[in-house]
Amino acid sequence: MGPRAQRARSTLRKLRRALCGRQDSPARARTPENRHFARKCARTCEHGYAHTHTCEDTPAKEHGHLGEHECLRGHGHAHAYEERCENKHKHLHAHEHTHERHGRAPRRLALTAPLPLLLLPLLLPPMILLFFLSPADAKPVLERQVFWNHSEPRASFLTPPHGPGAPPGGPFLTAVGGDGTLYLIPSNSSNPPVCVEIPLPYGPGHENVITLLLVDGGPRTPDALTVAACLEVGVSLLTTNATEPTNASNSSPRLTGSCEKLRTWALGNPPFTRVCGTGGGTPRCWALSTNGSIHDLGLDGVGYSPPQHNGTRPLLCTNTSEPHLHSCEHTAWNGDHDPQRCTRTPLDKHGQSWSPQCHKSTAPNQLGTRPPLLITKMSDENGTDYVYFLIGGSGDDYPPLLARVCEDDCWLSGHWTPRLQTVLQTNVSCANASALLKSTSGNGGPIVLLVEGEGGNGSICTYSGLDTGKHFAHTPQLGETGPRDPLVGACGHNGDVPESLAKKAREHPDLKQTLTPSGGPVALPGLDPRHVTALGTGPGLLFLGTNQSNVFLLRMNDNGRPNGSLTLFWNGTGNGNGRAGPRGPVLGLQHSSGGGAGAAGLLAVLFGDGVTVLRTEGAL
């Protein structure tokens, strides 16, 4: 055997002891994968050594110079496999240490590593989870969009249809587009984003549709859906079959005059819709019935109390031309189910105004020169229902006052007292209230007021429903002979009232103690409170939509106290469909749970050109 073969033999023996004979044998490998590669490397090394021994046992004269080169090539081949095994071993060794870091660290690491390094593997997974669930980083996800062809700045959300006449696939987000089409958008995230379009009659330019409202199918039309359309040219009533919602037909004549406002008051049997606005410059209201009839009520109103006990109780409304309240009752139904008529009466130097046909009305300007703004209905701790509203304000002799009346009449000192003669008022510490936000839903929810500040900015003040009720119930009032006991009573039905008690009630006493907010003020930086749309989804959340397409979020606790400051929830961009970028003012907001077990919450944002639905799961 030549010198070169001897050197190769010596080198291979050293490699065998270093690689194939090391302690990391297949039996000591920690994982099945490592054991497999260890056995493969061992077989490769043994094959190389067997080839080397064959070359060594062959006489040099038998293989000569060529044979020696063949053996050396075999040695080199084995050496290459050994290097490959060595590299693979290093990779597996590092892989095993990776498993050790996620499981039990080696003893030598426990003796030398600092304590924070040892705790890092345990803390890393929770830190990653908190990072992804952080409210500051979580963003709403685009769920679906609906666009209409004509941008309409007066587009609005409507009462969703339900009952036997509603189309299948609900619940719905209902909106009217500027193209004169009604859109029923499934709010359930499990339903496909398919809209039901109900064309409405409109004039040239598609610009005369102001708003409209769905009315459930009543007993007379159980299989149909009635749509009350409020147009610039008047009021129209349409009835459509639920199975063919696109085949709408005009079932009643139009009335001249426009509808600037629309409020609802469904009476249950038969269902009614009250549409109020101006007709020929004169404030008026219409009652639209599902049987195809339209009643001219003639009452000028801009605000209504929320639906009361399924529409079976009187309606509280405010006057447009004269700042006072009316109580329109439905006690004068006749055999044809016509609603009570309202008559036009002279009001001295103030001219003529439409008033209800009952004595339950405050005197003109008795509540200030600004029309009262109805806020919400809440129950006190005794279960008595009250309607809250805001009166007075900047530029008036009256300061901003928060007032309330019984939803129905009040029982005071053993007598029934008309509710409009028992208006209680209290000062609020958030002065110069210029705009009103929706209160959060549910009894005891906070009253939310948006107040005007310097430089066009504004602030949010919240008033706990429970604290507000206690303030009205337990604050001394000012009477004819000075301070007297709090005016505490129960709400009930109509009854006769002694004139002496009614005279005291008509004083509308101011509560001496000012109602202070339970939370706030929370600044609205750079936001004009006159151009903010608000949506309260419960005691915990308040959404604000701006005229820059943004949606802000304010979190509150159960008492209505804000938790932190106003945060940007959605910037109004990234809408897709070639319409990325700002969409214009937010015209409406609606929030729903999405329906179904585990379904994500959905926030619908209404713009002039369509509706964007955001999935809020994980972002609230």
Curated annotation (Swiss-Prot):
Residue spans crossing the bilayer: 113-133
Q: Which InterPro entries match?
A: Semap_dom_sf
> Which Gene Ontology biological process is one annotated for this entry?
symbiont-mediated perturbation of host apoptosis
Which keywords does UniProt give here? Host membrane, Host mitochondrion, Host-virus interaction, Membrane, Modulation of host cell apoptosis by virus, Transmembrane, Transmembrane helix
How does this protein lie in the membrane? Single-pass membrane protein
The UniProt entry's GO CC annotations, sorted and at most eight, read: host cell membrane; host cell mitochondrion; membrane
Q: Where in the cell is it found?
A: Host mitochondrion; Host membrane
The UniProt function text for this chain reads: Plays a role in the inhibition of host apoptosis. Prevents host TNF-alpha-induced mitochondrial membrane permeabilization and reduces caspase-3/CASP3 and PARP1 cleavage induced by the intrinsic apoptotic pathway.
Name listed for the protein in its UniProt record: Apoptosis regulator MC163R
